[in-house]
Amino acid sequence: MGGLRRRRVAPLGQHRSVASTQPFRQTASMTAEYVQSDQFRGARIHLCDLAGLEIRDCEVSGLKVVDCYGSTVYLGGDFKRVVVNDVDVTTYVEAELDRQHPLRRLAREAASPDDYRTTWDAIETLWAATLERARRLPEGKLHERVDGEWSLVETQRHLLFASDAWLGNAVLEEDAPYHPWGFPSGGMPADQAAQLGLTLDATPTLDEVLAPRQRRMATMRRVVEGLTEAELDRSCGRKPAEPYPDQEYVVRRCLKVVLGEEVEHHRYAVRDLAVLEGGERPER
């Protein structure tokens, strides 16, 4: 449910170990923070004050919250099934997201070469309008995070990485597919990102990151323009990046990941852009 959660969920079957030699740390505000730990797997938490608890980028299959109470509970991520007070709300949420963002369904259901072309046409149009809107804001706002989510510039960097990995490396098998400003999901260890040549602490401006980003979008345009059924069914000679599982990657799947990333991250971007423009922050 909800497609690819912004910046947090490992794409399409990418699993990572949660074991770590440093599972716990405390921030300057003395808030306990647990990172890459499996100590809560299968745990039972009873009669505890969990107000304000935040869980990000975690495997939560089988998570149960029973007989609990509170004013607001926010849930976001990639869930196959969600049940609230014995009511399965999965289909409702998916339908509502599709209603608000019709392009989600196009990207999800793309099957023929024409479907991929049509969806990419719409993605290009959406981002062009959104970036024009974003340029009306001061540059500083474009680096500002809303509720801990990635900034607009970080979003563009992530989409650059996603297309570098799934298109440039997996589909096209380029000699040097990864741009240094690419920004992977939070689950990729820093040493693995460095091995790909990524500079995670870079601080490019929006215009600077859009230069390689738009070149990669133009590459995607050329690919979908020449797409055939045979090409869609071709097995790729590489996986997207070294941390990804060793399995078969078909062009159809790889291009669909690119479409899905573009659509979902556009959804998050316009949500946060409304806040940066002076709107109310969504209640969470």
Tell me what each language-model feature is:
Residues T119-L126, T130, A162, T205, ...:
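Alpha-helical packing segments of well-folded alpha/beta enzyme cores
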